[in-house]
Amino acid sequence: MRVLFIHPNYHSGGAEIAGNWPPAWVAYLAGYLKAGGYTDVIFVDAMTNDLSEDQVREKITTLKPDIVGCTAITPAIYKAERTLQIAKEVNPDIVTVLGGIHGTFMYPQVLKEAPWIDAIVRGEGEQVMLNLVTAVDQGRFMADRNCVNGIAYAAPDGKVVATPAEPPIEDLDRITPDWGILEWEKYIYIPMNKRVAIPNFARGCPFTCSFCSQWKFWRDYRIRDPKKVVDEIEVLVKQHDVGFFILADEEPTIHRKKFIEFCEELIKRDLGVLWGINTRVTDILRDEKLLPLFRKAGLIHVSLGTEAAAQLKLDMVNKETTIEQNKRAIQLLKDNGIVTEAQFIVGLENETAETLEETYKMARDWNPDMANWAMYTPWPFSDLFQELGDKVEVFDFEKYNFVTPIMKPDAMDRGELLDRVMSNYRRFFMNKAFLQYPFTKDKERRKYLMGCLKAFLKSGFERKFYDLGRVGYWGPQTKKTVNFSFDKNRRIDAQTADELSRVDDGWVTMHGPKIEMRRRKGDDNFEIAKAAMACGGGTEQLTEEQQAATEVRAS
């Protein structure tokens, strides 16, 4: 029984500017399958190797798999669908499987537009995939698909079937990833010129922000034993020569006690590896006295979800942090030798040239080491997407990549929005390149920042940054001719829209019922009041009792 996993060849000009990122999903899935007795698992990274369709076809033909599996975030969905179609063209008997967050919630539409997909794994994939592979191995899968929990498929009569959800894996430490399945020499983090990994510290989130779907996908918040996470990192460092890692969690500092234990264990092991995280301003302020410990443990890069600059916008997005809190959190990190990156969301409905300029001025005032302006992108399966309703005009999911303006502001067209964002980038990083980075006193921070600048300049020179080459942007003189090439024929079909708008009784999460957002009379912006946040919104904290409860479930 041979299982072939393929990472689809999708590129967007976003996170890739820092290097090639190892697809951790395949290591966790392969490790779980091998522990379950299925050891013939092969991986092809079509994205990192930039494989053409013909090359993918050749790989499948040569490897002769029984099952081909792909994963897909929203912008990669069409590439994943095409990859699985190629597998069926090579051999119609191959069982084709799609996983990932997009298929989990958009399965009615995916199965309609890609009928060659035999099954979609919904949510956490390890146990579902093991059950599916077992059914295929026993020759009963196609006849008994309804007996495999956690999948969706199209029945012979065309009806879309979603089986009951598979319970989340309570003890994540049962999963031993097979990191050896990856070609590590190809996953280089450009700022440090070292191999990079993305291990899990926890899965899920205890909070239910409307712009996010992590809590909905994982269904339960579970955190790992910090010592076992460090065991995994030690394997990555000593066996695979990894020199930098980023925790995959949206916010690993949620569980304060466990995060402290994680840092203490890293210090104890003295692995000499640097790492980065995403987190919230409120967590940094909460942990002010712990920042020296974090830095001693190797934490070198923190990306903060500050999102919006003008206080008006902070209020509009229901962000319970203030401008001064953002500024203070950034300074605290810098004072402790930690590189800071501020994340801003742009392109809201009320965006203007003036608010974009305010964003730039605020970035200069806060003075983070780096700034990132991401386009406002409502995931089609998020609560936010439903709240926006007919304000969403673009359904070409390949462009849902945070660098393409999906939403059009009322006061400007998309080309001008892109141009002004590029102006912010140019001015911000020119100042850093000539007046700040080379003169940073901390040697390790200076080396890291100059490496980040190298990655930024490299992607700009190659026209890969922000997909500039593909859309035809060459500066302000081209803002009127930029072509985002939206496929206007793509829509959300009625069945998918119905599935998204109703509660799925078979998809139960740990979270209590959410409070429905209602439009305030006369307030045209209220429906997007929770919209413009990457992770970093709000001030919620886990209480000591809640932290203890997660530990009990994991034990």
Curated annotation (Swiss-Prot):
Question: Could you tell me which residue ranges the B12-binding domain spans?
Answer: 9-143
Residues that bind [4Fe-4S] cluster: 205, 209, 212
- Report keywords, A-Z: 4Fe-4S, Bacteriochlorophyll biosynthesis, Chlorophyll biosynthesis, Cobalamin, Cobalt, Iron, Iron-sulfur, Metal-binding, Oxidoreductase, Photosynthesis, S-adenosyl-L-methionine
Top EC class, one word = oxidoreductase
Write the Enzyme Commission number(s) for this entry: 1.21.98.3
Cofactor binding note from Swiss-Prot or TrEMBL: Binds 1 [4Fe-4S] cluster. Binds 1 adenosylcobalamin.
Q: PROSITE patterns per the record?
A: B12_BINDING, RADICAL_SAM
Cofactor(s) for this UniProt protein: [4Fe-4S] cluster; adenosylcob(III)alamin
Please give an example of a GO cellular component term from this record: cytosol
Answer yes or no on keyword Zinc.
no
Q: In which pathway does it act?
A: Porphyrin-containing compound metabolism; bacteriochlorophyll biosynthesis (light-independent)
Q: Identify the domain of life.
A: Bacteria
Spans through the membrane: none
Q: What happens when the gene is disrupted?
A: Cells do not exhibit a phenotype under high-aeration respiratory growth conditions. In contrast, under low-aerated respiratory growth conditions, the absence of BchE leads to an accumulation of MgPMME.
Matching entries from Pfam families are given as:
B12-binding, Radical_SAM
As its record notes, the protein acts as a catalyst of:
Mg-protoporphyrin IX 13-monomethyl ester + 3 S-adenosyl-L-methionine + H2O = 3,8-divinyl protochlorophyllide a + 3 5'-deoxyadenosine + 3 L-methionine + 4 H(+)
- Every copy of the Radical SAM core domain together lies at 191-416
GO function terms (MF aspect): 4 iron, 4 sulfur cluster binding; cobalamin binding; metal ion binding; oxidoreductase activity
Q: Which biological process, per GO, is one annotated for this protein? A: photosynthesis
- UniProt record similarity statement: Belongs to the BchE family.
Q: What does this protein do?
A: Involved in the tetrapyrrole biosynthetic pathways leading to chlorophyll and bacteriochlorophyll (BChl). Catalyzes the anaerobic formation of the isocyclic ring (E-ring) in Mg-protoporphyrin monomethyl ester (MPE) to yield protochlorophyllide a (PChlide a) via a six-electron oxidation and the formation of an oxo group at position C13 using oxygen from a water molecule.
What is the name attached to this protein's record?
Anaerobic magnesium-protoporphyrin IX monomethyl ester cyclase
Which species is this UniProt entry from?
Rubrivivax gelatinosus (Rhodocyclus gelatinosus)
Per the UniProt record, the lineage of the source organism begins with: Bacteria, Pseudomonadati, Pseudomonadota, Betaproteobacteria, Burkholderiales
